Amino acid sequence: MGKLGYPCALAAATKHDVVGYDVSPHAKEILRTRRYPHRELRAQDLLEETALRVVDTVDEAVRHAEIVFVAVQTPHQPRFEGTERMPEDRADFDYGSLREAVGQVAEAAARLEKRVTVAVISTVLPGTMRREIYPILNEWTLFAYSPLFIAMGETIPNYLNPEFVLLGVDANRTGGREAADAVREVYGTLIPNVKIEEMSVASAELCKVFYNVFLGQKIVVANALMEIAHK
């Protein structure tokens, strides 16, 4: 779950029956104490109001779920943090945690012989799902890519009031249409009249990265204008 998945789960729990799973026992501790440890708008209120549960195993989560949203970190290397001059070479994100999470869901679905939709919401570079994730899926797992456009600290209001929902599916893959319909149903119930932009998985990967780059460039321009104004 983590800092992204937890507030998203709380938001989804306002309209859906939601269970969460995290490798860290900290997730259950938050529910036990009913105290949200991070600065996140509405998180404390929803922690007290919703019926979100956290289970102990991936099997329990898959047994309960029709759709599993995977929210794990895809970090870049520290040298790309921007605290020092950017290196000349380039490197992809680290997808180790993402591969492990999706793999555990696929294995659990196979053990339980239960079809489940896997919807990844993490940020990745174009081509990642085809290269890193598709080989992990099996006959029991349908797949969709639905990355979020949120700001940490405002995850819940951003999640519940999006400009649009980005949905990447590959219709030529078995179960692609079924996976798309599952994601549409979740968001349609949660956010009535929400605008859903559906496209291929590769196009959705590119759209998410370009959106992030565009926002970053706006910040760069704003900072440059501020520097000029100060001079």
Regions found by a protein language model. Give the residues of each.
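N-terminal Rossmann-fold NAD(P) dinucleotide-binding loop
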Residues: G2-Y6
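Aromatic pocket-lining residues of Rossmann-like dinucleotide-binding sites
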Residues: A11-A12
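Conserved N-terminal Rossmann-fold NAD(P) cofactor-binding segment
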Residues: D17-V19, V23-I67, A71-D92, R99, ...
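Local beta-strand N-terminus motif with an aromatic residue
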Residues: H64-A65, R115, P162
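Glycine-rich, N-terminal phosphate-binding loop of Rossmann-like dinucleotide-binding domains
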Residues: V70-V72, S122, V169-D170
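Rossmann-like NAD(P)(H) cofactor-binding subdomain of soluble oxidoreductases
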Residues: H76-E154
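Internal alpha-helical scaffold of NAD(P)-dependent oxidoreductase catalytic cores
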Residues: R131-S146, I150-K231
